[in-house]
Amino acid sequence: LQAAEEGLSQAYNSPKMSELHDWAKAPHKATGGKTVGIYLGALGYGYNRELLAKKGLPAPKCWNDLLHSAYKDEIMMAYPSTSGTAYTTLASMVQLFGEDGGFNYMKGLHQNISQYTKSGSAGIKAASRGEITIGVVFVHGAVKQAVSGFPIEAVSPCEGTGYEIGSASIIKGARNLESAKKFI
């Protein structure tokens, strides 16, 4: 969206636009056709089943579960100023719990964070390696680790969650415009 706002991308109306989900069309409409959604990623977390069992910890099912003192130093997540994943986490908590409630949630979660990372996927990768128990991540990142054979359980929290829409754009003045149109 930022590239569209800054005039770096050009409008394109794909003949396939009518086949897309509403969430994919929304960025297209909002930018006058300068970007289109290509994936939707829901926020959540994943945990290492083996570490959880070894430490005798209950399986978390909700965002609020992560505030329990049993998870002190068991959670890794990215830092909001360096990671879109963490920024989405902060924004999601505000949307779920209200402004004061969201910031209070983040303060409570901070008490259980072992480490903040620059990358949004670092926490779940560390959980896959057995270095941390829980990683806050877009759920597809946890699923990727699970289907790769790691003992990871992906969680879509019970309270609901936020999400991102990844989008694609054609750069203004693209050298391979026809190829770009086919991709979009």
Name each model feature, range by range.
Residues G123-I124, H140-K144, E159-G162:
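Short, catalytically relevant binding-site loops at active-site mouths
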Residues Y71-I75, G130-T133, F150-I152, E178-K181:
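Loop/turn elements at helix/coil->beta-strand transitions in domains of secreted/extracellular proteins
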Residues L1-E131:
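Extracytoplasmic ligand-binding site segments that recognize negatively charged/polar headgroups
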Residues L1-Q2, S128, T133-P151:
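A ligand-binding cleft/hinge motif common to bilobed small-molecule-binding domains
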Residues C62-S69, S167-I184:
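Bilobed periplasmic-binding protein/Venus flytrap-like ligand-binding cleft at the lobe interface
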Residues A78-P80, F138-H140, P157-C158:
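Active-site-proximal beta-strand/loop segments in catalytic clefts of secreted hydrolases
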Residues Y105-H110, Y116-T117, S148-L177:
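Periplasmic-binding protein-like
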